[in-house]
Amino acid sequence: NKLQPDFLQENQRTYYPFGKLATETGRNGVSTVYLWTKDNGSYPVAKIVNASLAEVTAITGNPENIYKNGLYLDIETRLRNELPHAQITTINAAPLIGVQKTTDPNGITTLYVYNSDNLLQEIIWQGAVIKRYEYNYRNR
């Protein structure tokens, strides 16, 4: 089964048994690994660029659906230390609320603060509020 000469495969993807994206390899050969929360993968907890699933699994153990709201700190630290060639973004999320914290490949953390109604209230980057949301309710 030969591909048409004008057909160019962009990405190759693999999936976990629970249906979420496990790896994506671009045309340039760079592999990205995705890790998800343990509640059937509601939220991503890590995006690891320039690493293989085998490399990540050697550090995390079975990556299928094992993280509650984010990577355990020791696993995140090991990934960053043992995969210096990788660009790692981590995400912590609260069920039914949303993302609470992201840490980019440079180690810069962004916090997401929610109000008592679980609506996004502030985004804090490098200790400073960069975005504030105000909700004006009618008949409240």
Model-derived features: positions:
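Beta-strand elements of repeat-based all-beta scaffolds
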Residues: 1-26, 30-104, 109-140
